[in-house]
């Protein structure tokens, strides 16, 4: 090293071409190392959600943006910070038709945040809520902001029907349901998402009775979780005001109570009449709800004297053929585990969104993970699936359900063949 140092101190003319090249490379490496940025640690300091309402049920009088406002306000109050500390917000929302301009902006102002608070509405279909958390985390990691709110919201009860613009054709007009058109249809194969799931069931040889059994287990787990108070730290009550009537306070998810197990094996299949496997019982339902998390850098948490609940460890997106969307989480999860050097055995709890029972069974089968660690308190089949909310809901639930030091991995598929996954660690 001393000889090399002496050579480096020598004049340029005394160096051979090879040595000059070596000097340049060493200096380049040194500059690169010194200037390499360090990402900030991002923590979750609160995670709340509304109860999930059934389609045209208890929350149907509230628009998407109002549900978003309630979830945001609840998360900020739980965090115990002034609203002025929130510097930006991202909210997932899929079915935006008829909601008015900039739904996330409406939610932000409805929650009482300052007029100067920037906001962005995220649409990654069912993964929208999780993607909002991912994008907020990236902004915090790079130091662009230090306190943010992120989550997702959806009122499927309030999604309108639409008709094409133009002259009225002979025979009348045709109305289309935007829930189906913009939320539940594979635009590439021109089929319902359920038909895509049937394709996966056939490929992986996952029978109807397996899916029915999984659905019954989901309902059983959700009921047990509510009775044991497992959702107490995340669900905030929602007051619904009806003119001329007493206010109604909604405190619990509505969907898990609406099941008759004796009818589950008798239901007709919905998407494939012959040899089909998917029914109304083993698929998720149409629902209303919102979830929000307050995220900040570890430095901001210290500055604000806030105790973090969990830290964001890693996240990833993946994509496959659109028709194969049910297995896309397999790839996103694998990317996350590879990035952080963990094995599936290191994960204490898994949340795999139950768009269909088939989705969870397919991911358990392909990832070879322990079913007893997956969706231990139920999932979208029994709790409900407001599509813009669900990705945020499962991250928020892990935040509360994990024990100190444990890792939890949430994943969710989305239309078009995509998926998102996020790894957190309880603090």
Curated annotation (Swiss-Prot):
Positions contributing to CoA binding: 219, 258-260, 263, 284
InterPro entries in the record: Thiolase, Thiolase-like, Thiolase_acyl_enz_int_AS, Thiolase_AS, Thiolase_C, Thiolase_CS, Thiolase_N
Regulation affecting activity: Activated by potassium ions, but not sodium ions.
Enzyme class: transferase
Keywords, sorted A to Z: Acetylation, Acyltransferase, Fatty acid metabolism, Lipid metabolism, Metal-binding, Mitochondrion, Potassium, Transferase, Transit peptide
EC numbers on record: 2.3.1.9
Principal location class: mitochondrion
Catalytic residues (UniProt): 126, 413
Biological process annotations from GO: fatty acid beta-oxidation
Residues annotated as binding K(+): 219, 280-281, 283, 381
Superkingdom of the organism of origin: Eukaryota
Record's comment on post-translational modification: Succinylation at Lys-268, adjacent to a coenzyme A binding site. Desuccinylated by SIRT5.
Entry's Gene Ontology cellular component terms: mitochondrion
Pathway entry: Lipid metabolism; fatty acid beta-oxidation
Reactions this protein catalyses: 2 acetyl-CoA = acetoacetyl-CoA + CoA; propanoyl-CoA + acetyl-CoA = 2-methyl-3-oxobutanoyl-CoA + CoA
Site-annotated residues for Increases nucleophilicity of active site Cys: 385
Residues with PTM N6-acetyllysine: 66, 174, 181, 190, 202, 223, 230, 251, 257, 263, 273, 338
A GO molecular function held by the record: acetyl-CoA C-acetyltransferase activity
N6-succinyllysine PTM positions: 66, 78, 174, 181, 190, 202, 223, 230, 243, 263, 266, 268
Transit peptide interval: 1-33
Family that this chain belongs to: Belongs to the thiolase-like superfamily. Thiolase family.
Function (record text): This is one of the enzymes that catalyzes the last step of the mitochondrial beta-oxidation pathway, an aerobic process breaking down fatty acids into acetyl-CoA. Using free coenzyme A/CoA, catalyzes the thiolytic cleavage of medium- to long-chain 3-oxoacyl-CoAs into acetyl-CoA and a fatty acyl-CoA shortened by two carbon atoms. The activity of the enzyme is reversible and it can also catalyze the condensation of two acetyl-CoA molecules into acetoacetyl-CoA. Thereby, it plays a major role in ketone body metabolism.
Name used for this protein in its record: Acetyl-CoA acetyltransferase, mitochondrial
Lineage: Eukaryota, Metazoa, Chordata, Craniata, Vertebrata
Gene designation: ACAT1
């Amino acid at each position: 090293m001393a000889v090399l140092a002496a050579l480096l101190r020598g004049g340029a003319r005394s160096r051979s071409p090879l040595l000059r090249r070596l000097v340049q490379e060493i200096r380049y490496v040194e500059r690169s190392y010194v200037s390499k940025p360090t990402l900030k640690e991002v923590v979750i300091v609160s995670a709340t959600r509304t109860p999930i309402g059934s389609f045209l049920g208890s929350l149907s009088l509230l628009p998407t943006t109002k549900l978003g406002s309630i979830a945001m306000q609840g998360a900020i109050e739980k965090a115990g910070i002034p609203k002025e500390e929130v510097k930006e917000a991202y909210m997932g929302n899929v079915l935006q038709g008829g909601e008015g301009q900039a739904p996330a902006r409406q939610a932000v102002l409805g929650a009482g945040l300052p007029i100067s608070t920037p906001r962005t509405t995220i649409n990654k279909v069912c993964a929208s809520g999780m993607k909002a958390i991912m994008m907020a985390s990236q902004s915090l990691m790079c130091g662009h902001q230090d306190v943010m709110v992120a989550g997702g919201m959806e009122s499927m009860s309030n999604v309108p029907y639409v008709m094409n613009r133009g002259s009225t054709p002979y025979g009348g007009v045709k109305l289309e349901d935007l829930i189906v058109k913009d939320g539940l249809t594979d635009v590439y194969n021109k089929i319902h998402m359920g038909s895509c799931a049937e394709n996966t069931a056939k490929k992986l040889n996952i029978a109807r009775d397996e899916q029915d059994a999984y659905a019954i287990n989901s309902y059983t787990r959700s009921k047990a979780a509510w009775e044991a108070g497992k959702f107490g730290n995340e669900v905030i009550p929602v007051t619904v005001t009806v003119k001329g009537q007493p206010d109604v306070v909604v405190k619990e998810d509505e969907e898990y109570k609406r099941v008759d197990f004796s009818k589950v094996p008798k239901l007709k299949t919905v998407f494939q009449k012959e040899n089909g496997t998917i029914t109304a019982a083993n698929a998720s339902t149409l629902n209303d709800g919102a979830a929000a998390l307050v995220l900040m850098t570890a430095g901001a948490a210290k500055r604000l004297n806030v105790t973090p609940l969990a830290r964001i460890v890693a996240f990833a997106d993946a994509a496959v053929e659109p028709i194969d969307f049910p297995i896309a989480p397999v790839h996103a999860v694998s990317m996350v585990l590879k990035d952080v050097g963990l094995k599936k055995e290191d994960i204490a709890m898994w949340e795999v969104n139950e768009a269909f029972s088939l989705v969870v069974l397919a991911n358990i089968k392909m990832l070879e993970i322990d079913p007893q660690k997956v969706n231990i308190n139920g999932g979208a089949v029994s709790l409900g699936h407001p599509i813009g909310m669900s990705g945020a809901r499962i991250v928020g639930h892990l935040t509360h359900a994990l024990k100190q030091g444990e890792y939890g991995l949430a994943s969710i598929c989305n239309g078009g063949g995509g998926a998102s996954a996020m790894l957190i660690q309880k603090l």
